[in-house]
Amino acid sequence: MEVPAKIQKRIERLRHEINDHNYRYYVLSQPTIPDSVYDELFHELEKLEKKYPETITPSSPTQRVGAEPLKVFEPVHHEIPMLSLDNVFDEKGLRAFDKRIRQRLKLDKPFEYVCEPKMDGVALSLLYENGELIRAATRGDGYTGENVTQNTRTIASVPLQLRGNDYPELVEIRGEVLMPREGFAKFNREAEKRGDKTFANPRNAASGSLRQLDPRITAKRPLIFYGYLIGLLKGKDFPKNHCDVLKWFKDWGIPVISEIKVVGGIEGCLDYYEHLVKTREKMPFDIDGIVIKVNSLQVQAELGFVSRAPRWAIAYKFPAQEKMTVVKAIEFQVGRTGAVTPVARLEPVSVSGVTVSNATLHNFDELYRKDVRVGDTVIVRRAGDVIPEVVGPILAKRPKKAKLIKIPSRCPVCHAEVIKPEGEAVARCVGGLYCRAQLRESIKHFSSRRALDIEGLGDKLVELFIQEKLIKDITGIYQLKKSAITALPRMGEKSAENLLTAIEKSKKTTLPRFLYALGIRGVGDTTARTLARHFHELDLLMKASIETLQEIRDIGPVAAENIHAFFHQKNNAELINKLIHLGVHWPQEKAVVKSEIAGKTFVLTGALKSLTREEAEEKIERSGGKATSSVSKNTDYVIVGENPGSKYEKAKALGISLIDEEAFLKLLKS
């Protein structure tokens, strides 16, 4: 049926008016019509689109709701990792952050920072192509998140189409999804009346709402989105400053939190912090601190990143909320590396909306310094508003029979000896990979993606294998039989075959991956590559003295001692030999010959045709180079694949050498 021109014009007019009212309500906080009038406009548009379905477009305001439930969330790879921020908890830490930046930039005078509230919600990435929302993804582990596009489309403050026409060809807008306090209280009241599950706090409510498999449920939750950062950007140059990015957001219809302020120097940041400490309760949603960012994007690019956080930003957390309760018992947990940690079992108490019944005492030095005993009345707080910890006892309330806790002489799990080296705060079980507590975590680590990458061997299955005594040590992974696996609940023939295929595939690995998989304390994937590159053979590494290990660049005395102790423990040596006997193998690491890659730092952006990102990084490391995830002035080359991200733009701005895949492969052969 042909749509009359008059009707088409009215539909377009209604869409424009509704989008404009959304913009005024969510971005400008200046609504110009009552809700009832807005509802009338929306219902009129719905009726017209129902009568003329050929007029419906994906970006129409009516298309926020109505998608069918999903079976599972698809994974999304973040081209630019969604990194978290480092935290500081006092003025001293904040001043140290400022000092590090100025020293790195060789600046004496203060420079501009942008201060903003640290929203206590869920990080979200919005991808817009030619102004239209095409994908929304959660942070996940920072590298891989979940596709929550259908759910995000139901959030009224997220524009399905950016305003105006001055937006780039492709832009990734990062921000936070929140549930305002008022909406949270109302939701819990109504859920309680229905006898449904309630949420402990607004953050849990926002996270649970965003990850509903049925978008129609998300649509009923009072969620709001605020943008705070650009990830990918194509078809437009970055502006000069971060505050200019926020102005872009407002122009495009992306809500930006109003309490953002540009300040001169660290003193301005401290003033902003003090102001927000006093006014945080007046805000419509929960915040747990402030975020401080260098305003200049050029300076941000120069500073770059360290590990999993940017150097140019920091989170200054508010003092944690505190409550009193009683210590019922002090028990001991054993971690993957054998650390024996005292944990207080508490009379349950609500702190910041979360019921706390366990709290860490960190280590035995902390336990004795605080002098916490069973029976004590203690102050409990959520450190950084997240992790429960015991601040200390109230001595005036201490009962006469309060018991002082001693370091256990034996591991509570495997009964091996527990030792506490002089000068160290942590006591450790020496049972190694034979300790059941360490075994559970060690298998999870051993089979993880960056280690031997055994697909399908998840946490629950590991627990089940240990519980059923199918795996008694880490070598048991390679001795699993199909008949034993299929006898387990919910494990059919196909599942068993897939798992055994993945286990067999994992036998062929690399020396760096194998070293990382062993879970040696202090040996991450970077240190594992360093060790493999230096020794080339496992036997040489296992025989190395502490002095030899300390001669290697980036291996300090503590790491050297841990590596030496691990390989000189009889149980571990036997386990390694057994793994090799069971077929775990790798190509011998070749000594690095002089090449154009040796000593150079590389960053990859975009997809390569002939190699995965991990394969390319491994080849760089084997050739004596270094692969990093972010561009800085210390980067030598940026390898540009298909559909490069903003790393490409940053590299151009810093004058860093750009090479394509063909040039990179030639360098590898050099």
From Swiss-Prot:
Cofactor(s) this protein cannot do without: Mg(2+); Mn(2+)
BRCT domain location: 592-670
One GO MF term attached to the UniProt entry: metal ion binding
Enzyme class, broadest EC rank: ligase
Coiled coil, from the record: none
Binding positions for Zn(2+) per the UniProt entry: C411, C414, C429, C435
PROSITE patterns: BRCT (PS50172), DNA_LIGASE_N1 (PS01055), DNA_LIGASE_N2 (PS01056)
Gene3D superfamilies given in the database record: 5' to 3' exonuclease, C-terminal subdomain, 6.20.10.30, BRCT domain, DNA ligase/mRNA capping enzyme, Helix hairpin bin, Nucleic acid-binding proteins
Residues engaged in binding NAD(+): D35, S36, V37, Y38, D39, S84, L85, E116, R139, E176, K293, K317
Repressor keyword on record: no
GO biological process: DNA repair; DNA replication
Cystine pairings recorded for this chain: none
GO cellular component: cytosol
Residues at the active site: K118
EC assignment: 6.5.1.2
Keywords in alphabetical order: DNA damage, DNA repair, DNA replication, Ligase, Magnesium, Manganese, Metal-binding, NAD, Zinc
Function: DNA ligase that catalyzes the formation of phosphodiester linkages between 5'-phosphoryl and 3'-hydroxyl groups in double-stranded DNA using NAD as a coenzyme and as the energy source for the reaction. It is essential for DNA replication and repair of damaged DNA.
NCBIfam families the record matches: dnlj, PRK07956.1
Family: Belongs to the NAD-dependent DNA ligase family. LigA subfamily.
Protein's name in the database: DNA ligase
